[in-house]
Amino acid sequence: MIILGLETSCDETSAAVVQNGKVLSNIVSSQCCHTDFGGVVPELASREHERLMVAITDAALSEANITKNDLDVIAATAGPGLIGAVMVGLCFAQSMAWALQVPFVPVNHIEAHMFSPFIEAGAAKGVPEEPFISLTVSGGHTLLSIIGTDLSRRIIGRTLDDAAGEAFDKTGKMLGLSYPAGPEIDRLAKQGNPSFHRFPRALTAQSQTSKSYRGNYDFSFSGLKTSVLTWLQKQSPEYIDRHRADIAASIQDAIVSVLQEKTVAAALCHQINSIAIAGGVSANSALRAAMEKECSRQGIRLHLPGPVYSTDNAAMIAALCELQISRGMRPERRYSTAPFAGMPS
């Protein structure tokens, strides 16, 4: 079975071809037009997707050495995401499927991230034959879920305010780093001291104020953003410039320690021996190192996506479509393109 996947949920235009668990192509075009604005401008994102969609799809088919007539299924992100951006990909995919007379399958973007750590192991073949804890962490979402052997999902924790990826980007902007600031903080933090300043770690055992962390797998990062802003306002520009790497390392340590503590605690509490981390923040080197160290100490298997599959990409869309078909699951026909749409049940 040959599946074309399309991804346009935010500011990456991507098309990929997957056949029997193997990624034949995965073309990703990251939009650079948002840098000057310090964040994604929805209207610009939609127009860029519209401009690039045909060329990116042609490139994916060409790299896979197939033609559009070889396709058996077309899958596309159906949300959550920027509504205009999602609609560009959906309309293109549905029109192409209708013209080729092949099935169209809408795919939930967050759900696709959850299974992205298994793409390199062969998509449908790589998923563990046991329940696992999924930490899906990106610029828009921070979710802890239990994934069953039947691919069922139960969310046990989520952000109460801001996502971890947004905390990286916004605090990085406060430090004068370019957008997206997450990778910039990761790079800069390698030169800094994570113990330079202790920023808050809300709803955790490390919190100096919270009393309600036990058995609570929700996240909160708005307080961290406020704390960083307030602290920076008290420092001189010269001091900030001199210690920029130390500040970046301290911010990163605060975010990573919360993600690591809650994810491992959830696995231990529910007696689950596998953890999968996905989403753009899963590319963060400190998060990977912290999770590898703690999972090794606790005897928990850790699944991480390759760097190319951490950020938004169409291979994960096609791979999840193939996984669902291989398990005999009926494609979801009803979907919501809303930014915070829930996963299909």
Swiss-Prot record:
Annotated positions binding Fe cation: 109, 113, 312
Cofactor binding mode and count: Binds 1 Fe(2+) ion per subunit.
Keywords carried by this UniProt record: Acyltransferase, Cytoplasm, Iron, Metal-binding, Transferase, tRNA processing
Entry EC number(s): 2.3.1.234
Gene Ontology cellular component list: cytoplasm
Cofactors named for this entry: Fe(2+)
GO molecular function terms attached to this record: iron ion binding; N(6)-L-threonylcarbamoyladenine synthase activity
Reactions it catalyzes: L-threonylcarbamoyladenylate + adenosine(37) in tRNA = N(6)-L-threonylcarbamoyladenosine(37) in tRNA + AMP + H(+)
Family of this protein: Belongs to the KAE1 / TsaD family.
Record NCBIfam families: gcp_kae1, T6A_TsaD_YgjD
Protein name: tRNA N6-adenosine threonylcarbamoyltransferase
